[in-house]
Amino acid sequence: MSTTTAGILFALSLAVALAAVHVPLGDYMYRVYASEKHWRAERVAYRLIGADPAAEQGWGSYARSVLAFSAVSILFLFGLQLLQGRLPLHLNDPATEMTPALAWNTAVSFVTNTNWQAYSGESTQGHLVQMAGLSVQNFVSAAVGMAVAMAFVRGLARRDTGELGNFWVDLIRGSLRILLPLSIIGAIILVSGGVIQNFALHDTVVSTLSGAQQTIPGGPVASQEAIKELGTNGGGFFNANSAHPFENPTTWTNWVEIFLLSCIAFSLPRTFGRMVGSRKQGAAILAVMAVIATLSLSLMMLFQSQAHGTVPTAVGSATEGVEQRFGVADSAVFADLTTLTSTGAVDSFHDSYTSLGGLMTLFNMQLGEVAPGGVGSGLYSMLVLAVITVFVAGLMVGRTPEYLGKKITPREIKLAATYFLVTPLIVLIGTAVAMALPGQRDGMLNTGPHGLSEVLYAFTSAGNNNGSAFAGLSVNTEWYNTALGLAMVFGRFLPIILVLALAGSFARQGRTPESVGTLPTHRPQFVGMVTGVTLILVALTFLPVLALGPLAEGLH
């Protein structure tokens, strides 16, 4: 069997598994968020934080709760990192102490579900910070995204009310009923596949074949690895992330990790369909995600299997930066889905990809990570795209656009349009400023188009809350830690505020009855329209800078 055939079968097996869990997992998440019963542990949590689970929140109150919780989380994680040298289970190397700028960047990164890492995990963060700080944020940052998605869906489903649910209920339920049990199952599977789980510090020293001494780091990796993927977080316990054999030792664990980072995001459209009372609507959103993901994955595997140069031509593919235990095709699947979602974990070196392969990782993020996107964020981003598509279709036929019985008035389209302007502005302004400052250009290890691609990738990853990197850029500087931290904050919370405002606007409306002029939003034509609008929006926005970066490199 050729490696290409094996890679196609690898991808198909993932598609079959995701299709198999789509209905049961989507229905389960619907029951979680629609249930009126509270677990005992949940009631204890409500009392501890002083939340009334029976109280509903309008969009403003919901947004303030999201921002307040996230701000407290950033402060806690920031302080925990700076104090870790005085806490148990810390690393003994004084050189690993965090600077305030790096601690800020890391705290923001994990709270925003980005998991951008400007440090080497195994030599910087102690086990207590990994468990009580980073792993906890892997759970709750994902739960925040899911909560916002549920609030937006309620805005579409409800009528004549300004209430979107209760953030604290959504947050705790998402963490305890969905993410925690699934991550336990995932961790057990990963441990059985060879991922390590221990409390060993840097006290294991072995002799290498050359006679030198080498320190082998350990830690509670499997438990963090499971939620890292499941919550589309992506921050690695080790610097090499999922390319490290302690995090991802075999092809089987590689398959499991790709499945984990995709399963919730691909199942949420089913939850959406159940909540709005039309499973066909959920199926249409899923179809858009599947079409875009299939196109992207096909191109990624094609570009990585056809590389120029003596060695790649002899080997038959681009093997630089690829772990041989996975191979080019399986690594391409991982790279594609980690950038289509907001995960950002890597099992290969994206900076070593072909110019067009690297272009695909950039393009996937610039799509807004909607196919399927991050847990929660992918769904609400796709639904905003659906709103824009309905508006464009309404302009074409001269009718007032409606989506799920809700009219799209000037207020709604302004919010939706602003939503899709935020991230491109963050990415393009950040890249332009970095390229304009001579001191920041010194951090580029490559010149020319690839150097531009590295800077563009950094701000694209931060602004879209992905976290992966073209690692040929020195970003552990005060300027980059601060600038990328701001990009992550604005890229996460400005869209959330706009989405919640849009949800509140929809929730206050009544339901408009369908008429002969209503655009059907559950048919293949609508799937094609949303797909086209998504691709056109990205092409118009980012094509000029992509032409200067990866496209120019590919032509050269």
Swiss-Prot record:
One of its GO terms (cellular component) is plasma membrane. The chain crosses the membrane at residues 6-26, 65-85, 133-153, 176-196, 249-269, 283-303, 378-398, 419-439, 483-503, 526-546. It is found in: Cell membrane. GO terms for molecular function: P-type potassium transmembrane transporter activity; potassium ion binding. Disulfide bonds: none annotated. Keywords: Cell membrane, Ion transport, Membrane, Potassium, Potassium transport, Transmembrane, Transmembrane helix, Transport. The keyword Transmembrane applies. InterPro entries: KdpA (IPR004623). Signal peptide: none annotated. It is a multi-pass membrane protein. The keyword Transport applies. It comes from the Bacteria. Belongs to the KdpA family. Part of the high-affinity ATP-driven potassium transport (or Kdp) system, which catalyzes the hydrolysis of ATP coupled with the electrogenic transport of potassium into the cytoplasm. This subunit binds the extracellular potassium ions and delivers the ions to the membrane domain of KdpB through an intramembrane tunnel. The system is composed of three essential subunits: KdpA, KdpB and KdpC. This is Potassium-transporting ATPase potassium-binding subunit.
